[in-house]
Amino acid sequence: METIYLLAKLPEAYQIFDPLVDVLPVIPLFFLALAFVWQAAVGFK
């Protein structure tokens, strides 16, 4: 269990990017939502 935690934790040098890494997995969902809104705007052609 401790090994998994060590692999999941960013190295010390990259700690400043920790909040960014927490947000990155959500970005594809925004693209999915954008595609839906775009298709709704053009009438689902």
From Swiss-Prot:
Residues that span the membrane, as ranges: 16-40
Name this polypeptide is given: Photosystem II reaction center protein K
Role noted for this protein: One of the components of the core complex of photosystem II (PSII). PSII is a light-driven water:plastoquinone oxidoreductase that uses light energy to abstract electrons from H(2)O, generating O(2) and a proton gradient subsequently used for ATP formation. It consists of a core antenna complex that captures photons, and an electron transfer chain that converts photonic excitation into a charge separation.
GO biological process: photosynthesis
Keyword set includes Thylakoid: yes
Subunit structure of this chain's protein: PSII is composed of 1 copy each of membrane proteins PsbA, PsbB, PsbC, PsbD, PsbE, PsbF, PsbH, PsbI, PsbJ, PsbK, PsbL, PsbM, PsbT, PsbX, PsbY, PsbZ, Psb30/Ycf12, peripheral proteins PsbO, CyanoQ (PsbQ), PsbU, PsbV and a large number of cofactors. It forms dimeric complexes.
Record family assignment: Belongs to the PsbK family.
GO cellular component, one term: photosystem II reaction center
Subcellular location: Cellular thylakoid membrane
SUPFAM superfamilies, alphabetized: Photosystem II reaction center protein K, PsbK
Record note on disruption phenotype: Grows more slowly than wild-type both heteroautotrophically and photoautotrophically, approximately wild-type amounts of PSII assemble.
Entry keywords, A to Z: Membrane, Photosynthesis, Photosystem II, Reaction center, Thylakoid, Transmembrane, Transmembrane helix
NCBIfam families membership: PRK02553.1 (NF002715)
Propeptide: 1-8
Membrane topology summary: Single-pass membrane protein
